[in-house]
Amino acid sequence: MIQVESRLEVADNTGAKSVLCIKVLGGSKRRYASVGDVIKVSIKEAAPRGRVKKGEIYSAVVVRTAKGIRRSDGSLVKFDGNAAVLLNAKLEPIGTRIFGPVTRELRTEKFMKIVSLAPEVL
């Protein structure tokens, strides 16, 4: 459950380490984002020779949340922290590697590239 001002770690190799959610996309009154939702983020911490710089604004898709995802069979998938993958204007991942597990809920046409790059799909 991500809202404005939430901090997330970055689960790709773009050089960003942590980001801050500045907008949840998908409606003017939308308050929370969950796994698979697109948000606007500001880079708060970045590696010196990374692809992105501190202060830049990007779109990102949420790949892990501490709140968890309830499945139709009744199971709940939770993670230790919140994580996102940075996207370009065409909603394609900027990085070429994904770190850590991602959930099966990302398996839509938009984010199949992220699922294929991920080391583990839960």
Swiss-Prot record:
Database matches in SMART domains: Ribosomal_L14
UniProt-recorded Gene Ontology molecular function terms: large ribosomal subunit rRNA binding; structural constituent of ribosome
GO CC terms, sorted: cytosolic large ribosomal subunit
GO biological processes: translation
UniProt entry keywords in alphabetical sequence: Ribonucleoprotein, Ribosomal protein, RNA-binding, rRNA-binding
InterPro entries from the UniProt entry: Ribosomal_uL14, Ribosomal_uL14_bac-type, Ribosomal_uL14_CS, Ribosomal_uL14_sf
A Pfam short name: Ribosomal_L14
Biological function: Binds to 23S rRNA. Forms part of two intersubunit bridges in the 70S ribosome.
HAMAP family tied to this protein: Ribosomal_uL14
PANTHER family listed in its UniProt record: 50S/60S RIBOSOMAL PROTEIN L14/L23, LARGE RIBOSOMAL SUBUNIT PROTEIN UL14M
UniProt similarity note: Belongs to the universal ribosomal protein uL14 family.
SUBUNIT field: Part of the 50S ribosomal subunit. Forms a cluster with proteins L3 and L19. In the 70S ribosome, L14 and L19 interact and together make contacts with the 16S rRNA in bridges B5 and B8.
Name of the molecule in the record: Large ribosomal subunit protein uL14
Native species: Albidiferax ferrireducens (strain ATCC BAA-621 / DSM 15236 / T118)
